[in-house]
Amino acid sequence: MVYISNGQVLDSRSQSPWRLSFITDFFWGIAEFVVLFFRTLLQQDVKKRRGYGSSSDSRYDDGRGPPGNPPRRRMGRINHLQGPNPPPMAGGUGR
């Protein structure tokens, strides 16, 4: 990256990419990634054991708040016995 120092345009590539501060920053970045990765795995496991997030009424013990899960809509084939018949398809014979 180009920058200006004392009125002169300098290129930061003149510094060594393997300087000590880069190596230590890289090491601590990897260490923090590993720690956060395993911490999030363990937090997910604790939440599942305690029942967090699986029950919608666990936070509302006094009766206020949203009701339980609404009934699910059934997905499946179209019921042809309800409603009027569709109109005939338009089109010619091709002549």
Curated annotation (Swiss-Prot):
BP GO terms, sorted: calcium ion transport; endoplasmic reticulum calcium ion homeostasis; protein palmitoylation
Post-translational events: Cleaved by CAPN2/m-calpain in resting macrophages but not in activated macrophages. Macrophage activation up-regulates expression of the calpain inhibitor CAST/calpastatin, resulting in inhibition of CAPN2 activity. Truncated SELENOK proteins produced by failed UGA/Sec decoding are ubiquitinated by the CRL2(KLHDC2) complex, which recognizes the diglycine (Gly-Gly) at the C-terminus of truncated SELENOK proteins.
Cleavage, annotated site positions: Q82, G83
Domain of life, per lineage: Eukaryota
Membrane spanning residue stretches: 20-42
GO cellular component: endoplasmic reticulum; endoplasmic reticulum membrane; Golgi apparatus; plasma membrane
Pfam family name, one: SelK_SelG
InterPro entries for the chain: Se_SelK/SelG
Chief location of this protein within or outside the cell: endoplasmic reticulum
Location within or outside the cell: Endoplasmic reticulum membrane; Cell membrane
Name the UniProt record assigns to this protein: Selenoprotein K
Function of the molecule: Required for Ca(2+) flux in immune cells and plays a role in T-cell proliferation and in T-cell and neutrophil migration. Involved in endoplasmic reticulum-associated degradation (ERAD) of soluble glycosylated proteins. Required for palmitoylation and cell surface expression of CD36 and involved in macrophage uptake of low-density lipoprotein and in foam cell formation. Together with ZDHHC6, required for palmitoylation of ITPR1 in immune cells, leading to regulate ITPR1 stability and function. Plays a role in protection of cells from ER stress-induced apoptosis.
Record flagged with keyword Iron: no
Source organism of the structure: Bos taurus
Assembly information from the UniProt record: Interacts with DERL1, DERL2, DERL3 and SELENOS. The SELENOK-SELENOS complex interacts with VCP. Interacts with ZDHHC6.
Keyword flag Endoplasmic reticulum: yes
Keyword list, A-Z: Calcium, Calcium transport, Cell membrane, Endoplasmic reticulum, Ion transport, Membrane, Selenocysteine, Transmembrane, Transmembrane helix, Transport, Ubl conjugation
Bilayer topology annotation: Single-pass membrane protein
Disordered: annotated segments: 47-95
